[in-house]
């Protein structure tokens, strides 16, 4: 029996200089550099995982520049994404509070086929630095109030919790994919023209 491929698009967003590009490089190539140029627009990377004996997962990682939240281009960048990562710098309170704006922007422009928000992890990056500008209790409350799948502290520099966090996200996407397949198989071919569009869907 051949291997089955799953292709997922994952957004990596957050303010400038919180470590998005470093995260993508660390996760996709297991490399780290202190010297990265600011991303202009969007950058891409691919991560391939042998998920099981019969399943291969290919992740398209979209590293979106911090200033892009203020442009109309984000709708184009977000299209067809299966999940997202929102990052902030634990030593910078402004990047933490702006995570809410990033989440709101995502939720207003992107949903799963079911109409539900895409799974989204909140990563408290640069946890190797001190002092922290926000407490763990603040982050935990913020994560719950804003509908994140969950949060964890990370250090891209020290490679702390990167693979573990992404595995949680992949598991969530795989579960959603299986649910979509099950839903499609039970619906048959009948088209119900009276069904209202799912919340969050807009005509492009």
UniProtKB/Swiss-Prot annotation:
Tissue distribution of the protein: Expressed predominantly in kidney and much less in brain, heart, muscle, fat, liver, spleen, adrenal gland, ovary, thymus and lung. Not expressed in testis and intestine.
A Pfam family reported for this protein in Swiss-Prot or TrEMBL: Ras
Motif (Effector region): 36-44
Parts of the chain that traverse the membrane: none
GO biological process, one term: response to bacterium
Keyword Amino-acid biosynthesis part of the UniProt annotation: no
Record text on subunit structure and interactions: Interacts with LRRK2 (via the N-terminus); this interaction is direct and stimulates kinase activity.
The name this protein goes by in its record: Ras-related protein Rab-7L1
Annotated organism of origin: Rattus norvegicus
């Amino acid at each position: 029996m051949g291997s089955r491929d799953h292709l997922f698009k994952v957004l990596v967003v957050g303010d400038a200089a919180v470590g998005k590009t470093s995260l993508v490089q660390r996760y996709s190539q297991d490399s780290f550099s202190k010297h990265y140029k600011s991303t202009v627009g969007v950058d891409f990377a691919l991560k391939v995982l042998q998920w099981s004996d019969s399943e291969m997962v290919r992740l398209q990682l979209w590293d979106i520049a911090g200033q892009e939240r203020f442009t109309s281009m984000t709708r184009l960048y977000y299209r067809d994404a299966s999940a997202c990562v929102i990052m902030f710098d634990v030593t910078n309170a402004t990047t933490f509070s702006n995570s809410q704006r990033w989440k709101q922007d995502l939720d207003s422009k992107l949903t799963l086929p079911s109409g539900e928000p895409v799974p989204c992890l909140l990563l408290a990056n640069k946890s190797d630095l001190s002092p922290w500008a926000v407490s763990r209790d603040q982050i935990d409350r913020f994560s719950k109030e804003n509908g994140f799948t969950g949060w964890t502290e990370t250090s891209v520099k020290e490679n702390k919790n990167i693979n573990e966090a992404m595995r949680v996200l992949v598991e969530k996407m795989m579960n959603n994919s299986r649910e979509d397949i099950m839903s499609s198989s039970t619906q048959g071919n009948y088209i119900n023209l009276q069904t209202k569009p799912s919340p969050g869907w807009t005509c492009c």
